[in-house]
Amino acid sequence: MQKIWLFSIITIFLITELQCYPNSAEERLLSYIFDGYNSLIRPVLNASSPPIEVFFSLAFVLLINVDEKNQIMQTNVWPTMKWNDYQMQWDPREFDGIKTIRVPPDKVWLPDIVLFNNADGNYLVSFYSNVVVEHTGDMLWVPPAVYKSSCLIDVEFFPFDEQVCSLTFGSWTFRKDELQLSYLSGKRHVELNDYLPSGVWDLIDAPGLLIDERSKISYQIKIRRKALFYTVILIMPTVLMAFLSMMVFYLPAESSEKITLAISILLALVVFLLVVSKILPPTSSTIPLMAKYLLMTFIMNMITIMVSVIIINVYFRGPATHIMPNWVKTVFLKFLPVLFVMRRPESTEKELAKMKREKRERRSMKSALKTFFKRNDAKISEQPKQTSRKDGSSSEEKLSSDAKKAIEAIEYITTHLTHDNAFKRQREEWKFVSVVIDRLLLYLFFAVTTGGTVGILLSAPNVFEQVNQTSVIERLKQQAAEEMLNS
């Protein structure tokens, strides 16, 4: 019985010992390299050793968003860091030829590389992936990260703008004599092997630059906005409204819709100004290109409303309140109609001719009546003297009195008709002056609007320059490959 108990105890002891002993090469390797390893110590032999060199590269995966209002760029990137830890070396022949292992990042020393121009307080990476360890002591760490970085947005040429946003990485605690950065495999540009093109921005270039004596590395992300969306949604309606406001001068002055149309366009422009103000940052350094054009259109529309009021006032003028100056007749009734190839309505011309003809006829009739009555007076004075002096004098006075009354009546009617026709003629002249002013302002506003549209919208440097994103990505990939070969 005692022998059985002794055999059982020995068997249990042997099984326990076998389970505690590493039964694979990888387990033995991990026990070997972490025996006495301290992840808090910078992997250098002594304090006087040269600074540890961390090789850094950045893989650009996705441009998530550019928030112009808050001046923030959100990106999905893969920062790649490589350094050498002399404590993590082993001979692969002693561990079944194992040359590479993967360990959790909290088990080894990591360089505290963070994004300096962070905008949301999240300086570290979002996911701590495993560290790849080579038997030579080379450590490779590629943690994926989603960064929100601050970016100074230049809205001068919006929506045809280019932006240059930086991603600046560096050690948060180590001095430049303790840690230095270098390009990984000579890659001076971001890697674009896994880049997904954005639907809003085109990537133009993304060079890297070592700064502050190699203690930091800064990548300049140069992007250009795809303006098609804003061209269709914002620019084209604004341009159409700018030219539509000129149609106010094509409406007749007696139309009640002249001012209504101008005010409706003005309200639409106010709405577009509010839309632009919500998109762009409230900066006072520059005025956006689109805001300049909207402001120009807004001012032109305000002038249109004021001038339309003046035109309507001119249209309803008459000789009772306004006497047309000679210079107005010369400019607006003689010179400008010829310049603009304008003719007065035929009815007006016929009416003027009829008025002149009637005036001549009235003058002729008046002259004939005067001659007729003078002859009658002469005949009466030559009658025989037998007629009593009293009767002759009475008859002559009666005839002369009737003639004078008839002449006065004719003169009154003639004067009234003349004044009435003159009143109508002057009213028609004022109406025609308003039509000429409308035509003058139509041409003038068309020239100013066209010139302003071309001058403002075409002042952007990249209006007609199209970006082939596929070609740009291939060019940058090829450039990165050449940098690797030359390193």
Curated annotation (Swiss-Prot):
Residues 315-439 are cytoplasmic. The keyword Glycoprotein applies. SUPFAM superfamilies: Neurotransmitter-gated ion-channel transmembrane pore, Nicotinic receptor ligand binding domain-like. The keyword Cytoplasm does not apply. GO terms for biological process: calcium ion import across plasma membrane; chemical synaptic transmission; inorganic cation transmembrane transport; monoatomic ion transmembrane transport; regulation of membrane potential. Residues 21-231 are extracellular. It is found in: Postsynaptic cell membrane; Cell membrane. Its main location: membrane. It is a multi-pass membrane protein. Residues 1-20 form the signal peptide. GO terms for molecular function: acetylcholine-gated monoatomic cation-selective channel activity; excitatory extracellular ligand-gated monoatomic ion channel activity; extracellular ligand-gated monoatomic ion channel activity; transmembrane signaling receptor activity; transmitter-gated monoatomic ion channel activity involved in regulation of postsynaptic membrane potential. Residues 380-400 are annotated as: Disordered. Glycans are attached at residue 46. Keywords: Cell membrane, Disulfide bond, Glycoprotein, Ion channel, Ion transport, Ligand-gated ion channel, Membrane, Postsynaptic cell membrane, Receptor, Signal, Synapse, Transmembrane, Transmembrane helix, Transport. GO terms for cellular component: acetylcholine-gated channel complex; neuron projection; plasma membrane; postsynaptic membrane; synapse. The chain crosses the membrane at residues 232-252, 259-279, 294-314, 440-460. Disulfide bonds join 151-165. Non-alpha subunit of nicotinic acetylcholine receptor (nAChR). Probably acts in cholinergic motoneurons to regulate presynaptic neurotransmitter release, thereby ensuring normal level of excitation of cholinergic motoneurons during locomotion. Belongs to the ligand-gated ion channel (TC 1.A.9) family. Acetylcholine receptor (TC 1.A.9.1) subfamily. This is Acetylcholine receptor subunit beta-type acr-3. The gene is acr-3.
